[in-house]
From Swiss-Prot:
Pfam family, one: tRNA-synt_2e
Any GO MF annotation of the entry: glycine-tRNA ligase activity
Subunit structure: Tetramer of two alpha and two beta subunits.
Lineage: Bacteria, Pseudomonadati, Pseudomonadota, Gammaproteobacteria, Enterobacterales
Keywords: Aminoacyl-tRNA synthetase, ATP-binding, Cytoplasm, Ligase, Nucleotide-binding, Protein biosynthesis
Designated name of the protein: Glycine--tRNA ligase alpha subunit
UniProt subcellular location: Cytoplasm
Length: 302
């Protein structure tokens, strides 16, 4: 029997724990991708090593389709792996992980398609590849070159599994709502039973009923609060980063609502990127003041 989504997540956690990753919990805030988790966005900066993995609920408002599209969602799950420094054989380890969850790499058409990644609001970009299995993208590979507008050294390797799409391959189905989330002696639960109404109602809200004036007000207030926090005598860069994420959330919802012009969108992006850069520099300087304590014998410091 193929893996349920619940079993898939558990197997990925166990696999990456065996590769030396600490298993973290998802960020308890609305984000567009697992990269926004501070354990990725901030920890990718500076020389200190980090090996972590976690599941992250993600929201991309513009991808909402009122529950009518079989494989496109405005809310979905990513499994994130972060390794710094990135192992030379990280792609081989990834292929082994596919076999571990039940995907035979010899009997399936697996392609690495060049696709460099960037996130303008986070001031981030990297060299990357999409991983396609039998014609569907299921994973994004990225080697971060910059985060928060700062150069990444050593390079951080990121693997982002698309949980729903991998589960569709494993369960051999074409509609995400037919996925089996869990199956035990109490009952079998499908993705539709768990999330179908969420997709419908959130799409209606995102595209039709989100209050534009309220979203603009929230954006400005969160931006203002973040600026205040980084300008304190003893800057609070972690709360500031959370306020930045709230501002990005409102910006993305305004964009999905088509409530801002291209010129305004560019202006907001510049403001968010600048704020991310200031927070990132504060984080890096703080870690430097501690002597980069996670570097064993200063081995990663140059």
């Amino acid at each position: 029997m193929s893996l349920t989504i619940q079993d898939l997540i558990l197997k990925l956690k166990l696999f990456w724990e065996k590769q030396g990753c600490a298993i973290l919990q998802p960020l308890d805030m609305e984000v567009g991708a697992g990269t926004s988790h501070p354990m990725t966005c901030l920890r990718a900066i500076g020389p200190e090593p980090i090996f972590i993995s976690y599941i992250q609920p993600s929201r991309r408002f513009s991808d909402g389709r009122y529950g009518k599209n079989p494989n496109r969602l405005q809310h979905y799950y990513q499994f994130q792996v972060i390794m710094k420094p990135s192992p030379i054989n990280i792609q081989d380890i990834y292929l082994i992980s596919l076999q571990e969850i039940g995907i035979n790499i010899n009997n399936n058409d697996i392609k690495f398609i060049e696709d460099d990644w960037e996130n303008d609001t986070l001031g981030a970009w990297g060299v990357g590849w999409e991983v396609w299995i039998n014609g569907m993208e299921v994973t994004q590979f990225t080697y971060f070159q910059q985060m928060g507008g700062l150069n990444c050294f050593p390079i951080t390797g990121e693997i982002t599994y698309g949980i729903e799409r991998i589960a569709m391959k494993l369960q051999n189905i074409d509609n995400v709502y037919d996925l089996i989330w869990s199956n035990n002696f109490f009952q079998k639960i499908t993705y539709k039973e768990m999330f179908y109404q969420n997709e419908i109602q959130q799409s209606v809200y995102n595209f039709e009923h989100s209050n534009i004036e309220f979203l603009l007000f929230c954006f400005k207030q969160y931006e203002k609060e973040a600026i205040k926090l980084i300008n304190l005598k003893n800057p609070l860069f972690i709360p500031a980063y959370e306020k930045l994420l709230k501002a990005i959330y409102n910006f993305n919802l305004l964009d999905a609502r088509k409530a801002i012009s291209l010129t305004a969108k560019k202006n907001y992006t510049i403001r968010l990127r600048s704020l991310t850069n200031e927070i990132s520099k504060l984080y890096l300087n703080y870690r430097k003041s501690l002597g980069f304590p996670m570097c064993k014998n200063n081995e990663s410091i140059s």
